[in-house]
């Protein structure tokens, strides 16, 4: 007997998502207009919490769907306007271009990346040393490249590793789905679970590494550039100003990496299973034997394009996304990828996340229009100058954990500059606050995927369901790093930032510009 149209509509709504999840979302959609009618401020915070919930349930349903429904309703009931959302997207066009083109560009270099990281995996048998290598490499690259680019590279490599083992273990062709484990026997399934744990730990070490390196330089994160511009700092000024906080935090982050691996706590410590190592080694040997001069030339070209990529990004020759587009053009042209469908595969990873990020901008527009952060900012500016540093750091960290850290950093640096213009603080205090804001948005935000765009990209990537990396598991695995980075950062902001900056000023390494210079 055929079901009714109403039942069919309900089954189609969010597809295979659990019934309880569908009912929750329907409840949100009914509740929000009612709360907005009573209190727009409360409704705004409710929307933020609901959006975080959809991110937390990313493995139940891709957040674009439920989050998008909530955002569309927010527009309809007047929590924000379509024009404001357009402005937010326009303001973040560089990030959108980055996601569309840079992530796709990395796809065309995956042969070289897989070769390099396969040698790295097979060459370093110690899991602790391997974790350090991933964490340090991610930190170094993120100091000069964008964190999303770095994470995209590591994701591409991890999917490659997973695919090699899964296809061999399940006796399937390259085109088969990687999510289906039905063909695996119990022994191979157990090995696969250990391999998943191994990949999860490497991905988290690399993800945290992007935060450790990204905080150090003005090009490491988008909000760093905004803060540096507001304070009138050059690349060297920024590096030195942030060093009293960023260097101790980096050292403690590396120590944390070693400790969690040695103690095998918080989901870390799983070594590469020997059956997987054997398969990867056999794959590497076969690839080497089958490699023709044409294949070798492709690897050489990809290596040269990699040099171009790093050089162009380090020298800021163009917007990151446009550099990514040049990578696509060069790699596809010189490696002979001419079919439209083959080129189209490069974009399948990034476009859903780009759409999700646009929905996120709609939520940011609601946060601005409903003045959700206004009470917190007012409270912080009422504190004494010395306490302002730690309060700015803590509230930046708290809000960056639940919201976009680019948005939070922008809001706080604008408020600090407004206080400078009104004579509430002087130029020196403004520069101290700029460091507190920068470190506050970058360090504690590793607590959840919401704060770090790179973490959110990892959570919603094709890799996450393969290695069983859920929102809750990411929060749990990030917890030791969150505690260490937050507390060490807070201690440095409170105790070492001011004296070390005074020493830099006295030594002539940096200088405080006149207040009038900062106001322009």
From Swiss-Prot:
MF (Gene Ontology): sodium:proton antiporter activity
Main location class: membrane
Coiled-coil zones: none
Any one cellular-component term (Gene Ontology): plasma membrane
Compartment(s) of residence: Cell inner membrane
Membrane topology category: Multi-pass membrane protein
Transmembrane segments: 27-49, 62-82, 97-117, 120-140, 144-164, 202-222, 238-258, 303-323, 348-368, 391-411, 447-467, 475-495
Keywords per UniProt: Antiport, Cell inner membrane, Cell membrane, Ion transport, Membrane, Sodium, Sodium transport, Transmembrane, Transmembrane helix, Transport
Reactions listed under catalytic activity: 2 Na(+)(in) + 3 H(+)(out) = 2 Na(+)(out) + 3 H(+)(in)
InterPro entries in UniProt: Na+/H+_antiporter_NhaB
Keyword rRNA-binding on entry: no
HAMAP family linked to this entry: NhaB
Family: Belongs to the NhaB Na(+)/H(+) (TC 2.A.34) antiporter family.
PANTHER family to which the protein is assigned, alphabetical: NA(+)_H(+) ANTIPORTER NHAB (PTHR43302:SF1), TRANSPORTER ARSB-RELATED (PTHR43302)
Function noted in UniProt: Na(+)/H(+) antiporter that extrudes sodium in exchange for external protons.
NCBIfam families: NhaB, PRK09547.1
Name of the protein in its database record: Na(+)/H(+) antiporter NhaB
Species assigned in the record: Cronobacter sakazakii (strain ATCC BAA-894)
Taxonomic classification: Bacteria, Pseudomonadati, Pseudomonadota, Gammaproteobacteria, Enterobacterales
Gene designation per UniProt: nhaB
């Amino acid at each position: 007997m055929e079901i009714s149209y109403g039942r069919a509509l309900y089954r189609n709504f969010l597809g295979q998502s659990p019934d309880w999840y569908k009912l929750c979302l329907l409840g949100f959609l009914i509740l929000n207009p009612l709360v907005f009618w009573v209190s727009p401020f409360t409704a705004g915070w409710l929307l933020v919490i609901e959006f975080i919930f959809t991110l937390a349930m990313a493995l139940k349903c891709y957040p674009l769907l439920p989050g998008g429904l909530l955002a569309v309703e927010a527009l309809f009931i007047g929590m924000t306007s379509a024009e404001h959302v357009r402005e937010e997207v326009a303001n973040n066009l560089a990030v959108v271009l980055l996601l569309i083109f840079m992530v796709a560009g990395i796809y065309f270099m995956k042969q070289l990346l897989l070769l390099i990281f396969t040698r790295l995996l097979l060459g370093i048998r110690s899991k602790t040393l391997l974790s350090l290598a991933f964490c340090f490499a991610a930190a170094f690259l993120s100091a000069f490249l964008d964190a999303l680019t770095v994470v995209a590279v590591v994701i591409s490599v991890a999917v490659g590793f997973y695919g090699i083992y899964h296809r061999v273990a399940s006796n399937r062709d390259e085109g088969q789905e990687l999510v289906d484990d039905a063909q695996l026997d119990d022994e191979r399934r157990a090995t696969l679970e250990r391999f998943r744990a191994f990949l999860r730990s490497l991905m988290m070490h690399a993800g945290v590494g992007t935060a450790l390196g990204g905080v150090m330089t003005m090009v490491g994160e988008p909000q760093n550039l905004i803060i540096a511009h507001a304070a009138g700092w050059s690349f060297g000024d920024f590096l030195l100003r942030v060093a009293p906080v960023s260097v101790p935090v980096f050292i403690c982050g590396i120590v944390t990496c070693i400790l969690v691996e040695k103690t095998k706590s918080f989901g870390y410590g799983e070594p590469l299973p020997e059956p997987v190592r054997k398969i990867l080694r056999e794959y590497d040997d076969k690839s080497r034997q089958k490699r023709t001069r044409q294949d070798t030339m492709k690897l050489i070209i990809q290596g040269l394009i990699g040099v171009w990529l790093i050089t162009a990004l380090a020298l800021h020759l163009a917007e990151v996304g446009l550099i990514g587009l040049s990578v696509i053009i060069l790699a596809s042209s010189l490696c002979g990828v001419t079919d439209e469908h083959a080129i189209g595969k490069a974009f399948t990873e990034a476009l859903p996340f780009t759409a999700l990020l646009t929905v996120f901008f709609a939520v940011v527009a609601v946060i601005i229009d409903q003045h959700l952060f206004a009470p917190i900012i007012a409270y912080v500016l009422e504190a004494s100058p010395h306490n302002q540093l730690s309060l700015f750091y803590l509230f930046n960290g708290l809000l960056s954990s639940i919201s976009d850290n680019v948005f939070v950093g922008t809001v706080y640096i604008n408020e600090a500059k407004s206080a400078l213009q009104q004579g509430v603080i002087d130029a020196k205090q403004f520069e101290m606050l700029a460091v507190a804001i920068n470190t506050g948005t970058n360090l504690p935000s590793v607590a959840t995927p919401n704060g770090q765009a790179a973490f959110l990209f990892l959570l919603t990537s094709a890799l996450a369901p393969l290695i069983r990396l859920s929102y809750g598991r990411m929060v749990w695995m990030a917890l030791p790093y969150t505690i260490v980075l937050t507390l060490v950062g807070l201690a440095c902001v409170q105790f070492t930032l001011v004296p070390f900056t005074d020493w830099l000023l006295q030594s002539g390494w940096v200088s405080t510009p006149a207040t009038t210079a900062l106001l322009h």
